[in-house]
UniProtKB/Swiss-Prot annotation:
Belongs to the GrdA family. It catalyses: acetyl phosphate + [thioredoxin]-disulfide + NH4(+) + H2O = [thioredoxin]-dithiol + glycine + phosphate + H(+); acetyl phosphate + methylamine + [thioredoxin]-disulfide + H2O = sarcosine + [thioredoxin]-dithiol + phosphate + H(+); acetyl phosphate + trimethylamine + [thioredoxin]-disulfide + H2O = glycine betaine + [thioredoxin]-dithiol + phosphate + H(+). It comes from Clostridium botulinum (strain ATCC 19397 / Type A). Keywords: Oxidoreductase, Selenocysteine. Disulfide bonds: none annotated. Coiled coil: none annotated. Monomer. Component of the glycine, sarcosine and betaine reductase complexes, together with components B and C. The keyword 4Fe-4S does not apply. The lineage of its organism: Bacteria, Bacillati, Bacillota, Clostridia, Eubacteriales. The gene is grdA. It is an enzyme of class 1 (oxidoreductase). The keyword Oxidoreductase applies. This is Glycine/sarcosine/betaine reductase complex component A.
Length: 158
């Protein structure tokens, strides 16, 4: 079964990384439904934490659709910011400031530059929408951070 098939996708893009609309275009035709997409400024939020409104939206959508049906795709420009966002949607808000404080959703979460994402989307669309950013991002650092968070906190490892 594919990563996207039948999933409800929450996209949290980054103004300095990969924006939400670029990730959305990549997901078209995968069998997933994008239920929320935004583009944030990760360095603008307090200590790089996930925006409180986005935390609320993630929580509400997870309650509506079920955690097992949710897939979160991030576009953060840095590994640390991606890790904080991934930790928030899996283990709860590490800053204890938002609606996901002490809420362990365990959601599936990937970054748009990870091989698991790239392998599932149209290669031409990926190159057009994300390829240039991939060249300037610290891809290995992002992959390592995301893998560590998933291994430790994700409840739905396929």
């Amino acid at each position: 079964m594919s990563l996207f098939e039948g999933k409800k996708v929450i996209i949290i893009g980054d103004r300095d990384g990969i924006p939400g609309p670029a990730i959305e275009k990549c997901i078209e035709g995968t069998g997933a439904e994008v239920v929320f997409s935004s583009t944030e400024c990760f360095v603008u939020t307090a200590a790089g934490a996930m925006d409180l409104e986005n935390q609320k939206r993630v929580k509400t959508l997870t309650e509506k659709h079920g955690a097992e049906n949710i897939l979160v795709i991030l576009g953060a420009a840095e590994g640390e910011a991606a890790g904080l966002a991934a930790e928030t949607v899996t283990n709860g808000d590490p800053t204890f400031a938002g609606p996901l404080s002490n809420v362990q959703l365990g959601l599936r979460v990937y970054h748009a530059v990870e091989p698991e994402f790239k392998e599932e989307v149209n290669e031409e669309v990926y190159e057009e929408e994300i390829g240039m950013m991939e060249m300037v991002l610290e891809v290995d650092e992002i992959i390592e951070e995301m893998t560590d968070i998933r291994t430790e906190f994700c409840k739905f490892l396929d």
